[in-house]
Amino acid sequence: MKFFSLIPIILLSACATSYQSNGLTGGFEDTELSPGYFRISFRGNGVTSSERVNEFALLRASDLMLSNGCKSFQVLNGKDSINTSYVELPRTTTTNANIYGYGNYASANATTMTYGGGLKSVHRAKTTIDVRCINAEADPSQNIFDTNFINNKLKQKYRIN
């Protein structure tokens, strides 16, 4: 029985936005605003946590910095947001009827039941960060991160090759 209760958790975790370019299920977008200076956005879907969204934005920053030969990078500013939308859930109505007859007499009864329906809120996290290439020692108190360290740790955490 415990195995079956894990199935929904496994299915939901498999549906979180993967590390990918922006598409229907979310992903990253980046723009180089000037040499070594980028604006990066990462948008999740309805089952992607804010933590994952923020870490994937950092992962994208580290990928860009690696491709530009930067030892470290600095996060200059960031903005987190949650987009909430509503989905109408399907409603099912079932009617059961019984007819009883005896001689010239008949009677009937019917029961109608309605299930489901209503609205479900869906929350989609998004983060946008501005980062710049900086060749300095890592100092998290100044939002300066080691490019290789961040890249390796986040790829290991999320099992990305």
How would you name each of these model-derived features?
Residues 16-161:
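Secreted/extracellular ectodomain signature
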Residues 11-14:
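C-terminal motif of bacterial Sec signal peptides marking the signal peptidase cleavage site
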Residues 1-9:
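Sec-dependent signal peptide recognition
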